[in-house]
Amino acid sequence: MKFTAPLHAFTYWEKNNPDQLMFHQPFAQGSVKTTYREAGIEIRKIAQALIAMDYAPKSKIALLSKNCSHWIMADLAIQMSGHISVPIYPTINANSIAEIMSHSDSKAVIVGKLDNYESQKSGLEGFTKIGIKAYQVEEKLIWEDMVAQNEALTDVPEQNPEDLLTIMYTSGTTGSPKGVMHSVGSFNEVTNTAVDAIAIKAREPRFFSYLPLTHIAERIGIEMFGLYQGGSFNFPQSIETFADDLAATQPDLFFAVPRIWTKFQDSILHTIPQKKLDLLLSIPIINNVIRKKIKKKLGLLNTQAIFTGAAPISISQLIWFKRLDIDICQAYGLTEDCIRSHFNLPGQNKFGSVGKPLAGVELKFSPEDEILIKSE
């Protein structure tokens, strides 16, 4: 199925696979599972509540939260209400939050799962705040009350390719955070390109979302890719439960920055020292058993596509994981190009490179040897 916009994808799965699990959200007291039908009702009610707040069409609504089911529901509700999302990194300080709220001209903010909201709250003074009680965020407006008090929106607007969908602020590694304006069309094109390039063979694919959804790689590679595939989204409860939560999920696609791969490698070698691992992998009868046990422990037993990016990774480390049947594909992209750039792909992986241009991408070098990227 070829979709034309994020809401087209969501409403398709909501209608055609309503009982498919959409979210598995762990809490300290237990996990909450939400189907596409149940999520749709909640999203539509929040969208109706946002419309009732009577902001001008295409107003900016900020989103301050760590990854969780409510992050994605809020994103879809903002789209359904005809507004534009402004995700904010959940770890930045109050001054930076205030700057982004002002610069983006955001009218309101949805506040969800955070480590220390009290230290950030002053950055939201003067703005309408919607708190999510499930994450102990108490504000004048409460998400759960809005769900209880509103009817579900029935008329979902059609999204046009040229419509502004979101303003994504860069992490600031190249200076002050810059607000990158992405349209419905740019999100749709890159997601459809990724779906065509990365063949996930699973009837109900599973995804594990832990890198910030405010980052373009997670926003496209997990949220949008998973949404277009009609998959389920799983999240870690905390850093302490990360390994167990990932192992319980066994996702079909996984993305990690190089420092995560180093942690995985250290964890494996702590359990099986290198000399012992070399010996076990050299024994034909045992090596496949060892590989499967390691992959299952990591949560990568069923993973069909594994990616890394955002920083360099050594060829020696890629080769080390390859011996364990973990084929890590390096990719390259920017917030500014909506990560539609260069990818190694499963079965076409060349270590020491970031792969070939994706379909529709053109590349050249400037006289100063800058990489210039253009896409449709």
Show where each model-derived region lies.
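ANL superfamily adenylate-forming
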Residues: 115-161, 268-297
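Conserved AMP-binding/adenylate-forming
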Residues: 254, 290-376
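Conserved AMP-binding/adenylation subdomain of ANL enzymes
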Residues: 188-206, 213-293, 302, 327
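Structural core segment of the AMP-binding/adenylate-forming
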Residues: 53, 76, 80-145
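Conserved AMP-binding A3 loop
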Residues: 33-37, 165-191
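Conserved pre-ATP/AMP-binding loop-to-beta segment of ANL
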Residues: 18-21, 150-169, 176, 200-206
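Conserved AMP-binding/adenylate-forming core of the ANL superfamily
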Residues: 22-68, 72-76, 93-98, 102, ...
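A short helix-loop-beta submotif of the ANL/AMP-binding
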Residues: 60, 66-86, 90-94, 102-108, ...
